[in-house]
């Protein structure tokens, strides 16, 4: 989202009925998100759906003086989380913890985790 579309000096954190949305300043833009949507299509090409974008706009617009529109969006990106298997079918209910295993002599594998804890994950992998 272009920086001039949101009048603010700092980022925001918004709580929704399903998640938390972030509005983060980044250079000349704002990064607005995130969603946690099941993805059952091509795993090599995840994409933000119209429903994801509508959800974000609907919720962020509740706190903005000037609502954002689809035409304001300059780019979107999506990714998949490497979640560990668990008890639930819903990804939003699965643990964000990571696991480290020595697969073979000299080979360590790591699964799960979050981008925000990559340093802890790396340290755990090195200690193996």
What is each stretch, according to the model?
Residues 1-128:
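C-terminal catalytic lobe of FAD-dependent flavoproteins
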């Amino acid at each position: 989202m272009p920086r001039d579309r949101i009048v603010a000096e700092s980022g925001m954190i918004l709580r929704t009925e399903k998640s938390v949305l972030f509005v983060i300043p980044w250079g000349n833009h704002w990064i607005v998100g995130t969603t946690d949507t099941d993805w059952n299509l091509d795993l090599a090409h995840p994409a933000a759906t119209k429903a994801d974008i509508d959800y974000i706009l609907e919720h962020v617009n509740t706190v903005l003086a000037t609502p954002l529109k689809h035409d304001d969006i300059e780019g979107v990106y999506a990714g998949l989380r490497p979640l560990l298997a668990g008890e639930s079918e819903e990804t939003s209910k699965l643990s964000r913890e990571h696991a480290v295993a020595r697969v073979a002599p000299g080979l360590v594998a790591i699964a799960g985790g979050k981008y925000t804890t990559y340093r802890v994950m790396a340290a755990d992998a090195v200690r193996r």
